[in-house]
Amino acid sequence: MKSVAIEREFGSGGRDIGIRIAKEAQIPYYDGQLLIEAAKGYGIEIATLKEFDENKVGSFLYNIAMMAGYNQYENMAKINEIFYGMKETIKNLHAEGPAVFIGRCSTEILKSCEDVVTVFVRCSDKEKRVQRLSLIHISEPTRHSLIS
């Protein structure tokens, strides 16, 4: 059985799709919080990963890129630590067996693995994306501003 790596557009429902695939295939899924918890078992620095975890206004990769812009030289070591910590966690979990990986640059990290299917989930219906954001308790004005 293959693993699945999913990247998604904010509000597209990609996380829900990933969880559904994992349940149907009876394999584990890992998204932000679960990957951070799993990283503990591999001796990865958790505070650093949590600091740049995905949030409502940006992706994991976006947060790393923004951090690079603030003070490029001082932050380079921290950027590498964040990315490589998540990379090692995802690779270690993948080595343990098939799983669904949601976000956290998982498609890029696992792209060289032959036993991984990569997917990008997009939703062209802006109103459906806005509705999904209400499920995670984002206020009405904020919902529309987050969906471009």
Residue ranges and their predicted role:
Residues 136-148:
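Single conserved hydrophobic/aromatic residue that forms the stacking wall/gate
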Residues 28-39:
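Short beta-strand-centered segment that lines the nucleotide-binding/catalytic pocket of NTP-utilizing
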Residues 39-98:
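ATP-dependent small-molecule kinase phosphotransfer cores
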Residues 6-19:
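Glycine-rich phosphate-binding P-loop
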